[in-house]
């Protein structure tokens, strides 16, 4: 059995051992998560038993543990077991997704990383399908290890985004289109200033590029096309994306003409047999 305390970013579970079991309490560090560089993961001075288990001081979890005593008083009765307490490493990516597939750098080297317990069976199946069949039953883009552009693998970018994702990895609930705060306005089009003047909606970036989803300057087109635009009644569905405005722009362009900024789209050179 597992008890989650989302407000405290913590959980309690019975490990189910023989002779009465054992309670285990865990906490996800959300306010100021500590990042570990890959080069430091196997540091013998900081690890215990496994490279993913690092030494833990009681002071590091004192505040959330105190709150846990209130919700589950038996923890206070059992006390602190220093020998079996540790800091566990979590694998977090710049977009909080898993990494599944064949390494782009090493042919034949397959990975299934940054996978949480609840996602384990599904991710394992996707990896197996990729290896055996060469394709999967579902779209793999959000998990594909090759989805990141070189600029998204720069160390400072990775650390900034991982730090941001780690703060919301357990609580609170995060909108699927929640905009990132760190590492913004790094890649902009030659028209970015003008797009801002036109009221461009730049809530989300794509592959580090700032891309407008719609423009406030086109709001007058809403009145003309409102009857043809689907209504999204729930605020959650409309959050971070100006759907009505974007739909009006598309309809207006279908009836007339328009200009689309494609400067941030990738240009790829295809080489090899039949590349023409």
Task: Locate the predicted segments by residue.
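Structured core elements
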Residues: 11, 24, 99, 110-111, ...
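Mid-domain catalytic core of redox enzymes
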Residues: 1-23, 27-34, 56-59
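Active-site neighborhoods of metal-dependent hydrolases
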Residues: 27, 43-44
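A short local loop/turn or secondary-structure capping micro-motif enriched for an aromatic residue
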Residues: 25, 32-35, 118-120, 220-222
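A broadly conserved detector of short glycine/acidic/proline-rich loop/turn motifs that flank catalytic sites
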Residues: 7, 16, 29-30, 104, ...
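Surface-exposed intrinsically disordered loops and tails
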Residues: 1, 44-46
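C-terminal catalytic lobe of FAD-dependent flavoproteins
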Residues: 7, 35-38, 47, 51-175, ...
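Glycine/proline-enriched, intrinsically flexible loops and inter-domain linkers
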Residues: 139, 149-276
């Amino acid at each position: 059995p597992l008890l989650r305390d989302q407000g405290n970013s913590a959980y309690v579970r019975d490990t189910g051992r023989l002779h009465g079991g054992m309670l285990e309490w865990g906490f996800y560090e959300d306010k100021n998560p500590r990042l570990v560089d890959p080069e430091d993961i196997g540091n013998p001075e900081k690890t215990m038993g496994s490279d993913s288990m690092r030494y833990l001081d009681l002071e590091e979890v004192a505040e959330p543990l105190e709150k846990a005593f209130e919700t589950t008083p038996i923890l206070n009765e059992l006390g602190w077991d220093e020998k079996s307490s540790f800091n566990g490493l979590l694998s977090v990516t710049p977009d909080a997704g898993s990494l599944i597939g064949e390494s782009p750098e090493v042919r034949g080297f397959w990975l299934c990383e940054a996978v949480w317990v609840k996602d384990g069976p599904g991710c394992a199946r996707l990896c197996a399908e990729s290896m055996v069949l060469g394709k999967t039953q579902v779209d793999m883009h959000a998990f594909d290890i090759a989805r990141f552009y070189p600029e998204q693998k720069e160390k400072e970018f990775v650390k900034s985004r991982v730090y941001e994702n780690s703060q919301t990895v357990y609580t609170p609930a995060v909108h699927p289109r929640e905009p990132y705060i760190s590492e913004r306005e790094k890649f902009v089009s030659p028209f970015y200033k003008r797009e801002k003047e036109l009221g461009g909606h730049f809530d989300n970036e794509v592959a580090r590029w700032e891309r407008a989803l719609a423009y406030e300057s086109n709001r007058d087109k809403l009145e003309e096309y409102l009857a043809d635009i689907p209504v999204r009644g729930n605020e959650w569905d409309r959050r971070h994306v100006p759907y009505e405005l974007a739909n009006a722009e598309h309809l207006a362009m279908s009836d007339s003409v328009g200009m689309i900024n494609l400067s941030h789209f990738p240009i790829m050179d295809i080489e090899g047999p039949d590349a023409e």
